[in-house]
């Protein structure tokens, strides 16, 4: 426990909290244009071809975003919405594309967990 004299000389310093998603600039989502759509491989011990895209955001940031779900319709110059959320086995991927918003279509034939993949309720 510090004495009052010590605290007067050198006060306590608050820890600075660093954002995990700096490109969003405290917004829930951001819009951007795809500059490159490609696949990449995850870290060990996983193995796959993960679909990702490089995006130039409206605020000038250039980020890599993961495209979730089976199949997508994105190509260069597609306008997409991104949200925060990293992909644990892809280094440098800190954002997700929002399916079913702007140019990114929802996942075809999706029946469960539809809201996460931009799919409307099917007709009964």
Curated annotation (Swiss-Prot):
GO CC, any one term: small ribosomal subunit
SUPFAM superfamilies linked to this entry: Nucleic acid-binding proteins (SSF50249)
Modified residues (3-methylthioaspartic acid): 89
GO BP term, example: translation
Keyword Ribonucleoprotein in record: yes
Keyword flag Protein biosynthesis: no
CDD domains: Ribosomal_S12
Pfam family, one: Ribosom_S12_S23
Alphabetically ordered keywords of this record: Methylation, Ribonucleoprotein, Ribosomal protein, RNA-binding, rRNA-binding, tRNA-binding
GO MF annotations in UniProt: rRNA binding; structural constituent of ribosome; tRNA binding
Coiled coil, from the record: none
Functional description taken from the UniProt entry: With S4 and S5 plays an important role in translational accuracy. Interacts with and stabilizes bases of the 16S rRNA that are involved in tRNA selection in the A site and with the mRNA backbone. Located at the interface of the 30S and 50S subunits, it traverses the body of the 30S subunit contacting proteins on the other side and probably holding the rRNA structure together. The combined cluster of proteins S8, S12 and S17 appears to hold together the shoulder and platform of the 30S subunit.
Family, similarity comment: Belongs to the universal ribosomal protein uS12 family.
Stated name of the protein: Small ribosomal subunit protein uS12
Gene: rpsL
């Amino acid at each position: 426990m510090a004495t009052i004299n010590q605290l007067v000389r050198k006060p306590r310093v608050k820890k600075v909290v660093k954002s995990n998603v700096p490109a969003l600039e405290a917004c829930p989502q951001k819009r951007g244009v795809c500059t490159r759509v490609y696949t990449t491989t995850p870290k060990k011990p996983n193995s796959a071809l993960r679909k990702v895209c490089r995006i130039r955001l409206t605020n000038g940031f250039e980020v890599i975003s993961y495209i979730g779900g089976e199949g997508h319709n994105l190509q260069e110059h597609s306008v997409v919405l991104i949200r925060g959320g990293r992909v644990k086995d892809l280094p440098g991927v800190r954002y997700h594309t929002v399916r079913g918003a702007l140019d990114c279509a929802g996942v075809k034939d999706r029946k469960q967990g539809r809201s996460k993949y931009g799919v409307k309720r099917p007709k009964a």
